[in-house]
C-alpha cells in the first residue's frame, strides 16, 4: 500500500506525462514553467507539496521585492452596496507599466475592489474613517493574493492609498453615488482616472437611472482641472446647460465629488454651505 502511495507521487518517466503535470501546476498557480518543473521534481511529482513549495518561494520573493519602488499602476473605483457604506478610490501600484497592464495585475485589482467593498458594507462605511489604517487592513487581508501576484509578475505590487468620498454634511439626505472610470483596459472600475460623486435626491422615491449618475462622474473627470465655481460650468457635452441647471432638472443636488488620476493628488469639490 505504501509502495502504491509513493508511486502516485513519483515523477513520470514519460516526458509528456511530466509536462502535463507541469501544465496543471502552472494553471493552478500561474507560476513560471521553470518553477513548476523544479517544484515537481523536488517533491517527486506530489502536486500538493509542489504547490506549497511554490507558495513559500513566492512569499520569499515577495519579501525581497517588497521595498522596490512602485511608480506605475491603476486606480480602482469601490462603491458600497448602499450609500451608507460609502465609496472610495484605491491606488494599486507595480514597478512597470508593462506589469500593471498584465491580466493577473488587473485581476488582483478586481479582488482588492471586491474585498474593500465587503469591508465597507460590513462596517457601514466606518473602515474609511482612517484611510491609512484601511490600507494596512486591506493589505493584510489581501496578503496571499499579493504574494502570488508578485511571484507571477516578478515585480513588487502593493496597495498604495485609499481616498474616501466624503459627502457634505449639509447635503446628505437620500444620497446617491455615481462612478466613472477613464482609461480602463476593459476591466470594470479599474482605470487611469476615477471620478466619484455624491448626489442628494430632491424628490423622494424617484428612480434615478445609473447612467445619470455616471454622467455626473464623467463630467467631474473631464473638468477636474477647471477653476471656478463648478455649478456655473457648462455640463460636459452641453453648450447650454450649467452643472447646477442639469442637476436641478433631474431632481438632484450636488454634495461632493472626488477625482483621482493615478500618480496625482485627488481633486475634491464639496457643496458650499448655504448662507445664513
Curated annotation (Swiss-Prot):
Which Pfam families does this UniProt record tie to the protein?
EF_TS (PF00889)
> Which is one GO molecular function term here?
translation elongation factor activity
Q: Offer one example of a GO biological process linked to this entry.
A: mitochondrial translational elongation
Which cellular components does GO assign to this protein?
cilium; cytoplasm; mitochondrion
InterPro entries attached to this UniProt entry: EF-Ts_dimer_sf, Transl_elong_EFTs/EF1B, Transl_elong_EFTs/EF1B_dimer, UBA-like_sf
Subcellular location per the Swiss-Prot or TrEMBL entry = Mitochondrion
Which keywords accompany this UniProt record? Elongation factor, Mitochondrion, Protein biosynthesis
Source species, domain of life: Eukaryota
Q: HAMAP family, alphabetically? A: EF_Ts
Tell me the protein family, please. Answer: Belongs to the EF-Ts family.
Q: What is the official name of this protein in its record?
A: Elongation factor Ts, mitochondrial
Q: Which organism is it from?
A: Leishmania major
Query: What lineage is on file?
Result: Eukaryota, Discoba, Euglenozoa, Kinetoplastea, Metakinetoplastina
Amino acid at each position: 500500500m505504501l509502495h502504491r502511495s509513493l508511486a502516485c507521487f513519483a515523477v513520470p518517466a514519460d516526458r509528456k506525462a511530466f509536462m502535463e503535470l507541469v501544465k496543471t501546476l502552472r494553471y493552478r498557480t500561474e507560476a513560471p514553467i521553470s518553477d513548476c518543473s523544479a517544484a515537481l521534481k523536488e517533491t517527486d511529482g506530489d502536486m500538493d507539496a509542489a504547490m506549497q513549495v511554490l507558495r513559500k518561494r513566492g512569499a520569499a520573493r515577495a519579501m525581497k521585492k517588497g521595498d522596490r519602488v512602485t511608480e506605475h499602476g491603476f486606480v480602482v473605483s469601490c462603491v458600497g452596496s448602499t450609500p451608507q457604506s460609502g465609496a472610495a478610490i484605491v491606488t494599486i501600484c507595480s514597478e512597470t507599466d508593462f506589469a500593471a497592464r498584465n491580466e493577473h495585475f488587473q485581476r488582483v485589482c478586481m479582488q482588492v475592489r471586491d474585498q474593500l467593498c465587503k469591508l465597507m458594507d460590513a462596517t457601514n462605511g466606518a473602515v474609511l474613517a482612517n484611510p491609512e489604517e484601511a490600507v494596512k487592513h486591506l493589505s493584510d487581508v489581501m496578503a496571499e493574493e499579493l504574494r502570488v501576484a508578485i511571484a507571477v509578475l516578478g515585480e513588487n505590487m502593493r496597495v498604495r492609498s485609499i481616498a474616501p468620498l466624503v459627502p457634505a454634511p449639509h447635503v446628505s439626505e437620500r444620497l446617491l453615488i455615481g462612478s466613472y472610470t477613464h482609461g480602463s483596459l476593459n476591466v470594470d472600475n479599474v482605470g487611469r482616472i476615477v471620478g466619484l460623486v455624491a448626489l442628494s435626491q430632491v424628490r423622494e422615491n424617484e428612480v434615478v437611472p445609473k447612467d445619470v449618475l455616471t454622467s455626473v462622474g464623467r463630467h467631474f473627470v473631464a473638468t477636474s482641472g477647471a477653476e471656478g465655481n463648478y455649478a456655473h460650468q457648462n455640463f460636459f457635452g452641453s453648450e447650454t446647460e450649467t452643472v447646477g441647471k442639469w442637476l436641478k432638472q433631474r431632481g438632484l443636488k450636488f454634495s461632493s465629488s472626488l477625482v483621482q488620476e493615478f500618480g496625482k493628488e485627488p481633486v475634491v469639490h464639496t457643496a458650499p454651505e448655504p448662507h445664513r
